[in-house]
Amino acid sequence: MIFKETFKMGLKDIDKQNQIKNVTLLEFFENIGSYHSDLAGYGADYTKEHGRGWVLLDWKVQVLKRPKYGDELEIHTWAKTMNKATTYRDFEVYNQNKELCAIATSRWTMVNIKEGKIDKIDADIIKAYDPEDKNVFEEKEVTKLKAPKDFSNEIEYKVRRKDIDINGHMHNIYYLDLAYE
């Protein structure tokens, strides 16, 4: 099932060049993925009720044309390959002129939050998402980034309460913010 949602670009979504920030793009992806999970019955309410939730493992994003302030974006997402431990979710971003602006893929796992362990993605979950056989990138796997041997900049950071997400850990978006610093 392909899920679609419209987002309007506001001031907080743009940089000094009047273009979408990378963090904003990831936030849009996360939100539409969450709305799709809500529809499938495995979203935020499920996490609170069952103590199980989706955890992002990695992303791959390609921006083809940067949206600007005021643009209305239609974002499409769908679950694809699912196995007992991980699943992939793809995204396409279109502007109001129906131009493809960005594509992305992400890899997720289901975690038992109380135990901090990976939980099985069972047949009921797979059926609820109705995975698509459609890929935005030719290669299926997301290449893992390698940490540089030397860092030009280091800061000490103490996790704040506002950094904690529904799964009880630092939200993945804040890591990108820290990397920019």
Question: What residues fall within each predicted segment?
Answer:
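Hot-dog-fold acyl-thioester-processing enzymes
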Residues: 1-56, 103-105, 112-181
